[in-house]
Every structure is written in structure tokens, then in C-alpha cells.
Regions:
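Membrane-proximal extracytoplasmic
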Residues: 1-341, 383, 457, 636, ...
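Signature of alpha-helical transmembrane segments and their immediate interfacial
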Residues: 2-34, 428-430, 498-550, 607, ...
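Interfacial segments of transmembrane alpha-helices in multi-pass membrane proteins
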Residues: 5-12, 288-291, 327-384, 450-454, ...
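Short helix-loop junctions at transmembrane helix boundaries
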Residues: 35-39, 322, 373-389, 449-466, ...
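Helix-loop junctions and hydrophobic alpha-helical segments within the transmembrane domains
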Residues: 319, 326, 330, 406, ...
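Transmembrane alpha-helices and their membrane-interface boundaries in multi-pass membrane transporters
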Residues: 395-409, 431-450, 457-499, 605, ...
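Juxtamembrane segments of multi-pass membrane proteins
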Residues: 531-629, 633, 638, 674, ...
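C-terminal transmembrane helical bundles of large multi-pass transporters
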Residues: 632-1007
């Protein structure tokens, strides 16, 4: 007695099992988290170290190099990159997916602490954070007021909003855009300092002496104890202005005599505006792999409770929220599930024309899908675009077994058997075929589970979701389906009006197939050249269809990055960015908000568009118009960018090509020629390279002999310049319970040209004031403003945006061609960002594809106890792939992760049809019918179930092919590939399988 017979004989048991599946499914669904995609972010740790005033070369040699040298030995590092720029070193360490984020952070902290002894004494201690320094924020809270200054708003943002938001679980960091943090700025006048015989070093020494508070002990009496506190710290502008710098000739020289103290912003070279209004923005950056929706919900909740703590005149709003796209995208896929369910039920009814028979699959579909949610919960998965796509695809799949089982039982009832007898016999006949097709389908997705890297992580949930649905649907098809069939199905003495009207069509279809199949089998040799033609078509189209990682989605967001030429001032770039902002306002009426930010050296205009349903133009069309418009603004450079589907790095273009060399001189030599060819290439719309050699610098050459004769050391000169020009932190002061920096430098207007250095004086060891001009010579030069390393090598990363109609695959091929023409043997190339993921995923998917074919062949060989019979089924695979590629090419689709997974799915889907025919033909042969007649009869008998299951799969996927709204492009890519493959393969399989079977299969009638 098999499980189907047991369910028929014990219907209550079968019902209880079904209720348990539904119950656990609902419980699992209620506990599942929601996110856009499965967690595929590599663990990334950033190390940042500041050394104010130091140039890129000093930072590279004294900070970046020792840190990298120590970090490099940590196991599990995937890549390590660094940027050494003016005053700061930033190292980004990316680990393999298998490495735990906490373990990685601890390893890096350990290595950084060991390296600290090699760093300059006066640099800030390195900080280690669990996030990419270039990670994209997911949400921005804006803070504005018509009564308060940006300094006050920044304080509110820091003390109230940031403090609350950074404690949210899985938040890596909270930044304040446009922050004007309080600082005590000491502006020094070099002429007055020279008159009083004061140097910047004297100011630093005076602060170290006077702005100090040390523990002073206590006074103990017989009954009381008093703690002594020496009030040595300065808090107000007046106290700093009254600071005694030195005493000379019975005269006290105060800071106010040689300069002034004022409470001002720490960073004077940055600002942020939203919709033209200056304000500050608090942005939230998630940890790698964090659930963005959970974080956003927590932010909304905290902001709601925080409103009562904010002053009445302070208004908060949301500048952007990336999770709106995620929520809408998930809702769109949910809607598709319902559409697919309705379409599948309609097609089943049209084929069976009996509401009782149709009711059985109607029950099986929800049972299979709801039960899948419990398996997803047990596996630790989430509700995301891919797991929901798995549910959509499952709607058409899970119904197949139920249809085949129900139809087989119904045929017997119509022949006059009792429902119970028909159920037992019908289930027994189809039992093996149901298990075979299900095992085959699971075998397709099994290789995906073992795929490494981002692709494997992405589609693990997808493949496990479908596999889980197939397992539950198989169980339902073998238990509840035969039980329901015996309870619901009865022999119809009189056919319905609808049945009578439509039956001639089905009879005619059967007769047409019988005639055409007989004709095809008489010329069955045609099948072989037809398969060869399909294989050739696959080879041609596979190369012809452009490839990319994933199609670009309309996320209702566009970003424009602005860059000034090296040496351009902050004010120059600010004016240019505001010009771009005005351009956006005039060209994009669909903009909901426009946020402009400028800091030293770079600017950004971020456009949040209205929802897709509310505008006529797509994000891509708007970006195309903006790209053309910003090219006319030639005072500086602007790049229009759109966020990639699988990407979190801020502001990166799709093509990231890294050139590595052993010396900076070789890069300087080769880069101009390489970039010229990139600019001339029609494949790229725009291009840039991070390594520049154009930042002007004034080099100070010290006359050491003269300096030593006059009693001035190199250290004296360097310190005087450091404290006078670099805006060096000279200490801290406290205000409102918070610590702020004391910054000192010479007035900007008194040091705006190299000749102004003459007015700076240095004190000799004899106490004499010596003009710096007597000891140094000035030499103007150019140098790289930033130095880059990639995997320890000096590097330059060429970033390129793609021309219209071009894909990342074509872009990388073009870069490879230019590199082959331009670079010598002493260069190495590497890929970064989306480019690296694309190349790795391509090879990974090809491995999964070949493994799926091999696994299915082996499983079928085991099922049929023959190495020949599976060949009949496997030869239908080229038909499906060719169909998919033809439909993709006709609809302008690219070869991407979604379409490739669809193609892998097709292997299992078309194999199902072949199994049904071959299994029945083998049974007929064993009953004594010869091979040719057996395959003819089996094909005719299986025609309706094959057409019905294929039509249900196709219609279940049809909503994907016409998807609109958020995240539609990925769904369309997958839908077109699978529907195209199914349409072509279903029509051809009905003829090719019988023809190949007659040639290849084992002759069982003689046994």
C-alpha cells in the first residue's frame, strides 16, 4: 500500500496532515522578515586615520603602508583597497561571504592596535568601523528651522537625533550631512604676531598650559570630605580671547593682541540644501547584510517619540527613504502571485470544464505555497523579491502534479469505475511519474545551493523556495489530491453546455496532433537536424545577446556627482553645484526633492522622484536627458548616476577597471594614453580615473645650513607651518556637556598666495624672531591629491558609465581590449565593484547550468534504469534554451542573473513533459506494444495533461512578462526567458521526443 492508497482509505488523516501544513505555514509567514534581496553583502571593515595637514604622500608612507602591512595577513580577505588623501587615510577591507562580520572586525582591530606603534605620535588614533566607508545611506531625516542657525540645528541633530538613531540594531553609523559642528576657532594675524614676537607654536604651548583640568585630590576633616576641583578649562569666547600667550618686559600678551577667538563651525567648507533651503540631514548607514526595512521602521518609530523633545520651531521630514522602493517591489510581486493563481485556475477550468475537477488544484496551490513559508522560516530566509518570485513561479509548478493525478483518476471514473477504485488505480499508475518529475525539478535547483559568492547567496533562497514548494506539492499530489478526487469527482451522465460546446475543439486538437505526429514520425530523421539547428542558434544568440549583472531598476532616484579641477576652491565648486541644481529644477518637474551637498573637492545633487505611477517618464529617460544637459556645463565636471540593482557602494559607475603598478611613475606615464582611448570609445558615455596628477602644491625647500647656523631646526619650521596653516586641532573645550575642538590657523585673507609665507616668523634657540623667508625657498609643483592601493599595489581605478544600449559585459570587453593595446607586462589589472561581481557570477552560473544538466541526466538514468532513455528527454533542453534566447532577443532583454536563472529553471520544466511521455511509452512497451506504437499512444494520451501543465506554467508566469511598477525589469527578464522557452519547447517536444524515442530508447517490448 503506497501513501496515495493510504490517504484514500484514511481521508481524515490526509485532511489533518493538510491542516498541519497550513497551520505551520501561517506561523512561519508571520515570523519572516522583509527585505529587498537576501543578505549578500560581504563583510566590510573600514579603518580611518586622520593626520591633519599631512599631504597624500606622507599619509601613504607613514600611515597607510604600516596599517596595510599589518592587516594584510588576516585570513578570509577578498580585497583590500585604500585611499591616502590630504590629512586622512582610509582603508576598506572586504572579506569573503563565509567570514563572520564580528570576527572580521575583531581581527582588524587587533592588527590595527599592533600597527599603532609605527604611526606618527601626533596623528589621531585609527578608528575601525563595521561598514564600507563608501556605503550608501538608506534614509535621511532632514532638520530645519526658520529661527535657528545651522550651528544650532547641527547641535540638535547631534545631541538629540543622532544619539537616538545610532543605537538602532544593525545600524553601522549615523552621519550628519551639512553639519556645522561648534568649534572654538582661533584666527591669528601674522603681522601682529611678528610685532609681539609670537609664533603659532607659542599659541599651542599657551593652550597646553592654561586649558587644563587635572584631578586635585580632596580635603578630609573629622566628619566631612571635600573633593577639590581646579577650574582650569576655558569655555567661552571671552576666556579664550583673554588667554595669556606669554609675558614679555612686564607686559602680558593675550590672544586678543595677536588674533581673535570666535565660536564658529568646525568645517567651513561644506553645506547642504534641500529644495533650495539650507538645513542639516541625518543619514542612516546600515551594517553589511542588515535588514533595511527593520531599520527604517525603527527610525520612523524613534522620530515619532523624539518629536516632543525637539523645540517647536524645528521641523523634521524625510529627504529620501530607499525602503519605499523595497516595500513597493515586494507588494508588486505579492500582487503577481494572486494574478498567477487566478490565471492558472482559469486555464485548468478551460481544459477540464468541470468545476469539481478544478476545485482540487484550487486547494492544492494554497497548501503548497503556504507550507513553503514554514520551510523558509526554518531555513532562516526572509520575504524578499527573489523568495517571492520563487512563490510566483511555484504557482504554475505545484499545480502540475495535482492536474496529472486528478486527470488520471477522472478518466477512470468517466470509464465507469467507482471513485475509490479509480483513485487507487489512477494514483498507482501515475505515482512513479509524479515523483520522477518532482525529483527532476529539485535536481535543477540543487546545484544553485552550492554556488559560491554573491550569486549563490542571492539565489539560494530562490532555489530552496521553489524546491520546498515542489516537495510539498508532491506530497499533496500523492495524499490530499487522490483523497479529494475520490470525494469530489463523480461520473457525469450529462455533460454541461460549456463542455458540449468546447469538446469539438479538443477532439479536433487531438485529431490534428494525431495526424501531424504520424506524419512527423514517418520523416522522423528531421528531428536530428532540427536539434542541431537549435544548438547552433543557441551558440549564436548566447554571444549576440549583451550581458550584464542585473537590469537597471527604476528606483525613483538619480544622483549627480560634481568634481572641480584639482586646485579649484570650495567656493568655485559650490557655485558650479548650485548651477547643476538649478538645471535639475528646470528639467525635472517630476522631482519630489532635490538635495545638494558640497564638501571640499566634491559635490552631489541627489534627486528623489515621485512614485513610478505618478510620472510619465522613467528614471532612465530623465537620467538620459540630464546626462546630455550636464555635459554643456563645462566649468567643472558632473556625472549622472543611477543605483545598480545589487550594489551598495556610493557613487560608483558600473564599469570599475583597476590598473595596478609597482611605481607611481609608470601609472603617470601610461594613464593619459589609456584614458584617451577610453574617452574615444563609443561603448562609454562618460569616464573618469581616481588617480590624478594635477593638484598644485607649494614645496618648501629648507636651507639646512643656514637654519642650523641661526639656531632653527627643521622641526621648528615644520611645527610653525603646521600650527599656522593646517587648521591643526590644539585641544578641546566643553560646552553643554559636549566636547568640541579648538582649531587655530592664520587668517585666510593673509595666506591666499605663496608669497604670504614670508610674513610668518619662527623663533630660534636664542629667542630671536627669524623671518621664514630667510630660511626657505618655494617651489611650485603638481602632485596626486590622493594615492590609491588595491590589494597592496599602487593603483588607479578607471570608472566608466555605459553608452545607451551598452551593457557591463561589453564595457569590460572594451576595457580588456584597451588594456591589451596600452599596458606593458609590468602592469596587472583587476576588477572592482559591480564589474567584479558580474565576472564572478557569470562563471558561477555556467557551472550551475552544466551541473544541473548532468544531475538531471543521472537522476533520470536511475529512474528509468537506462542510460539511453534520459537522452530522449535531455535533447529537449536545447529547444527550451533556444526558445528563451529568441524571445529575449526579440524583446530586447539582456543576459543577466534573472534571465540565466530562468534558463536553468527551463531544464527542469521541459524535462517534466518529456518524462510524462517516456514513462507512459515505457509502460505501454512493457504491456506488449511495440516501440513506435507505444510512443504514439503515450504522446496522444499525455497531450492534454502536457498542454494543461505547460499552459498553467506559462500563464502563471505571464504576469511577470508584463510587469510594471517597482522592480519590474528583473521580473520581466525572468518571465520572458521562461515563457519563451516553455512556449517553443512545449510545441516542439510533442514531436521531437517521440521521434528521438523511436531511435534511442531501450526496446522493452522484447523483454
Amino acid at each position: 500500500m503506497n501513501i496515495s492508497e493510504l490517504s484514500i482509505r484514511r481521508p481524515v488523516m490526509a485532511s489533518v496532515l493538510t491542516i498541519i501544513i497550513l497551520l505551520f505555514g501561517f506561523i512561519g509567514y508571520s515570523y519572516l522578515g522583509v527585505r529587498e534581496y537576501p543578505s549578500v553583502d560581504n563583510p566590510i571593515i573600514s579603518v580611518t586615520c586622520s593626520y591633519p595637514g599631512a599631504n597624500a604622500d606622507v599619509i601613504e608612507n607613514q600611515i597607510t603602508e604600516p596599517l596595510e602591512q599589518n592587516i594584510n595577513g588576516i585570513p578570509g580577505i577578498r580585497s583590500m583597497s585604500s585611499v591616502s588623501s590630504q590629512g586622512q587615510s582610509r582603508i576598506t577591507v572586504e572579506f569573503e561571504l563565509s567570514v563572520d562580520l564580528e570576527t572580521a572586525a575583531n581581527d582588524v582591530r587587533d592588527k590595527v592596535s599592533r600597527a599603532q606603534r609605527y604611526l606618527p605620535r601626533d596623528c589621531d588614533p585609527p578608528t575601525v568601523t563595521k561598514a564600507d566607508a563608501d556605503a550608501t545611506p538608506i534614509l535621511m531625516v532632514t532638520i530645519q528651522s526658520d529661527k535657528r542657525s545651522l550651528l544650532e540645528l547641527s547641535e540638535i541633530a547631534d545631541l538629540t537625533v543622532k544619539e537616538q538613531l545610532q543605537t538602532i540594531n544593525n545600524v553601522s553609523g549615523v552621519q550628519i550631512w551639512g553639519e556645522k559642528r561648534y568649534s572654538m576657532r582661533l584666527w591669528l594675524d601674522p603681522a601682529k604676531m611678528a610685532g609681539y614676537g609670537i609664533t603659532p607654536v607659542d599659541i599651542k604651548n599657551a593652550l597646553d598650559r592654561e586649558n587644563v583640568e587635572l584631578p586635585s585630590g580632596s580635603i578630609e576633616g573629622n566628619t566631612t570630605e571635600l573633593t577639590i576641583r581646579t577650574m582650569g578649562l576655558m569655555h567661552t569666547t571671552q576666556e579664550f580671547n583673554d588667554l595669556v600667550v606669554r609675558e614679555a618686559s612686564n607686559r602680558i600678551i593675550r590672544l586678543s593682541d595677536v588674533g581673535r577667538a570666535e565660536l564658529g563651525p568646525q568645517d567651513t567648507r561644506s553645506y547642504m540644501k534641500m529644495n533650495g533651503i539650507p538645513m542639516v540631514g541625518v543619514v542612516v548607514i546600515p551594517q553589511p547584510g542588515a535588514n533595511h526595512i527593520d531599520i527604517a521602521d525603527a527610525v520612523y518609530q524613534r522620530m515619532e517619540t523624539m518629536k516632543k523633545d525637539l523645540p517647536d520651531d524645528v521641523v523634521t521630514s524625510y529627504g529620501f527613504d530607499n525602503t519605499r522602493f523595497i516595500r513597493a517591489s515586494i507588494d508588486e510581486v505579492r500582487q503577481t502571485v494572486y494574478e498567477a493563481f487566478i490565471l492558472v485556475i482559469i486555464i485548468i477550468f478551460l481544459f477540464l470544464r468541470n468545476w469539481r475537477v478544478t476545485l482540487i488544484p484550487c486547494i492544492v496551490i494554497p497548501v503548497s505555497l503556504i507550507g513553503t513559508f514554514f520551510l523558509m522560516y526554518v531555513a532562516g530566509f526572509s520575504i524578499n523579491v527573489l523568495s517571492m518570485l520563487a512563490v510566483v513561479l511555484s504557482v504554475g509548478l505545484v499545480v502540475d502534479d495535482a492536474i496529472v493525478m486528478t486527470e488520471n483518476i477522472y478518466i477512470r471514473i468517466e470509464r465507469g469505475m467507482t471513485p475509490k477504485e479509480a483513485g487507487i488505480e489512477g494514483a498507482k499508475e501515475i505515482f512513479f511519474a509524479v515523483i520522477s518529475t518532482s525529483v527532476t525539478l529539485i535536481a535543477v535547483f540543487f546545484p544553485i545551493v552550492f554556488m559560491e559568492g554573491m550569486t549563490g547567496r542571492l539565489f539560494r533562497e530562490f532555489s530552496m523556495g521553489i524546491s520546498g514548494a515542489v516537495v510539498i506539492s508532491t506530497f499533496a499530489a500523492l495524499t490530499i489530491t487522490p483523497m479529494l478526487a475520490t470525494k469530489l469527482l463523480v461520473r457525469q451522465e450529462r455533460k454541461s453546455w460549456f463542455y458540449s460546446k468546447t469538446e469539438p475543439f479538443f477532439v479536433g486538437m487531438n485529431n490534428f496532433y494525431q495526424r501531424t505526429l504520424a506524419g512527423f514520425l514517418r520523416r522522423r530523421w528531421v528531428a536530428l537536424p532540427l536539434i542541431a539547428l537549435m544548438v547552433g542558434l543557441i551558440g549564436w544568440l548566447w554571444r549576440a545577446i549583451p550581458a550584464e549583472m542585473a537590469p537597471l531598476e527604476d528606483r525613483s532616484q538619480i544622483s549627480i556627482n560634481t568634481r572641480g579641477s584639482e586646485g579649484a576652491t570650495y567656493e568655485y565648486l559650490r557655485d558650479y553645484t548650485e548651477d547643476i541644481n538649478r538645471l535639475v529644477d528646470s528639467l525635472v518637474p517630476e522631482a519630489k526633492s532635490v538635495t545638494a551637498r558640497v564638501s571640499s573637492g566634491s559635490g552631489n545633487v541627489r534627486i528623489a522622484l515621485t512614485d513610478i505611477a505618478e510620472r510619465k517618464r522613467s528614471q532612465m529617460e530623465i537620467a538620459e536627458e540630464l546626462s546630455a544637459a550636464v555635459r554643456t556645463k563645462t566649468k567643472a565636471r558632473a556625472f549622472v548616476q543611477q543605483q545598480s540593482t545589487f550594489g551598495g557602494r556610493r557613487g560608483n559607475m558600473p564599469v570599475q577597471y583597476v590598473l595596478q603598478a609597482t611605481g607611481i611613475e609608470r601609472l603617470q606615464e601610461v594613464l593619459p594614453e589609456f584614458m584617451r582611448k577610453v574617452y574615444e570609445s563609443p561603448v562609454f558615455q562618460m569616464a573618469d580615473v581616481d588617480l590624478k596628477f594635477s593638484k598644485p602644491e607649494a614645496r618648501i625647500i629648507i636651507n639646512r645650513d643656514k637654519s642650523n647656523l641661526l639656531g632653527v631646526s627643521t622641526r621648528d619650521i615644520a611645527q610653525t607651518l603646521q600650527y599656522g596653516l593646517s587648521g591643526q586641532r590644539m585641544g578641546y573645550f566643553y560646552m553643554n556637556g559636549k566636547q568640541y575642538e579648538i582649531l587655530a590657523e592664520i587668517n585666510r585673507q593673509q595666506r591666499n598666495k605663496p608669497a604670504d609665507l614670508q610674513s610668518i616668523y619662527v623663533r630660534s634657540d636664542k629667542g630671536e624672531m627669524i623671518q621664514l623667508d630667510n630660511l626657505i625657498a618655494l617651489e611650485e609643483n603638481v602632485a596626486p591629491p590622493q594615492l590609491y592601493h588595491y590589494n597592496r599595489f599602487l593603483s588607479a581605478t578607471v570608472s566608466a558609465g555605459l553608452a545607451k544600449g551598452k551593457t557591463i559585459g561589453q564595457g569590460l570587453d572594451e576595457m580588456d581590449r584597451i588594456a591589451a593595446e596600452t599596458l606593458g607586462d609590468d602592469f596587472r589589472t583587476a576588477l572592482a565593484g559591480d564589474s567584479k561581481e558580474f565576472r564572478e557570477s557569470s562563471s558561477s552560473l555556467m557551472f550551475a547550468f552544466l551541473l544541473a544538466i548532468l544531475l538531471i541526466y543521472l537522476i533520470l538514468a536511475a529512474q528509468f534504469e537506462s542510460f539511453k532513455d534520459p537522452l530522449v528527454i535531455m535533447l529537449t533542453v536545447p529547444l527550451a534554451i533556444a526558445g528563451a534566447l529568441v524571445f529575449m532577443a526579440a524583446n530586447g532583454q539582456t543576459m543577466n542573473i534573472f534571465s540565466q536563472i530562468g534558463i536553468i529553471m527551463l531544464i527542469g520544466l521541459v524535462a517534466k513533459n518529456g518524462i510524462l511521455i517516456v514513462e507512459f511509452a515505457n509502460q505501454k512497451q512493457e504491456a506488449g506494444i511495440d516501440k513506435l506504437h507505444a510512443i504514439e499512444e503515450a504522446s496522444l494520451q499525455r497531450l492534454r495533461p502536457i498542454l494543461m501543465t505547460s499552459a498553467s506554467t506559462i500563464l502563471g508566469l505571464l504576469p511577470l512578462t508584463v510587469a510594471t511598477g517597482e522592480g519590474a525589469n528583473g521580473r520581466i527578464a525572468m518571465g520572458i526567458a521562461v515563457v519563451g522557452g516553455m512556449v517553443v519547447s512545449t510545441l516542439l517536444t510533442l514531436y521531437i521526443v517521440p521521434a528521438i524515442y523511436s531511435y534511442v530508447s531501450t526496446d522493452r517490448s522484447k523483454k
